[in-house]
Amino acid sequence: MIRITDAAQEHFAKLLSNQEPGTQIRVFVINPGTPNAECGVSYCPPDAVEATDTELKFDKISAYVDELSAPYLQDAEIDFVTDKLGSQLTLKAPNAKMRKVSDEAPLIERVEYLLQSQINPQLAGHGGQVTLMEITDDMLAILQFGGGCNGCSMVDYTLKEGIEKELLEKFPELKGVRDLTEHQRGEHSYY
C-alpha cells in the first residue's frame, strides 16, 4: 500500500523517540478522491488508534491508515531527501485525487484515471489541467484544457507530443486525441 524508504523511516524514528512511548505515525488523505485531496502525516499516539485502522509495520516504525484513506494511498511513497539545499520529507500519492481503477474498467474510466494521476500533476506545475470530455464512437479522446494551459502557445505541443503519445501508448484502442478548448490568451496563460 505505502512504501516508506529507509531514510524516511530513520527520520520518523528519530522524531518518534521524543514522543510518548508507543506513538507511531498516521498517514491520511483529506478530501480523498477529489481534486482538493491533500495527504498528510501526523503523530499517532496509542490512544488515537481506531479499530478500523490498518497498521503497516516497517523495520523501524509502524504507520496507521484509516479505512477511508486506504484506497487512495495505494502506491504511495514517503521519502526523506537530502541535497545541497537541505532535507525534506516527500509524500507522493498518485491515487489521492482519484481511486485507482482496474484494467477491466471501462475505457473512459481508465483514461480519466491516467489524466488525473499522471498528466494533471505535470500540468499543475504551470497552473494548468486537462479534463476528459468524452470518448467518441470513432475512439477519439476529446479533451478540454484549463488554467494556465488555456491560451498557452505550447498547448499543441503538449497535446500531440505529451498527452496523445502517452494515451495512445497506454490505450491502443484509442485512435487519437482532440482539443475542444476555445483558447483565449491572457494573463492566466503559462506561455
Swiss-Prot record:
The keyword Iron applies. It comes from the Bacteria. The keyword Iron-sulfur applies. Keywords: 4Fe-4S, Iron, Iron-sulfur, Metal-binding. HAMAP family: Fe_S_biogen_NfuA. Belongs to the NfuA family. Its cofactor is [4Fe-4S] cluster. GO terms for biological process: iron-sulfur cluster assembly; protein maturation. This is Fe/S biogenesis protein NfuA. GO terms for molecular function: 4 iron, 4 sulfur cluster binding; iron ion binding. Binds 1 [4Fe-4S] cluster per subunit. The cluster is presumably bound at the interface of two monomers. Homodimer. It holds the Pfam family NifU. It comes from Sodalis glossinidius (strain morsitans). [4Fe-4S] cluster binds at C149, C152. Involved in iron-sulfur cluster biogenesis. Binds a 4Fe-4S cluster, can transfer this cluster to apoproteins, and thereby intervenes in the maturation of Fe/S proteins. Could also act as a scaffold/chaperone for damaged Fe/S proteins.
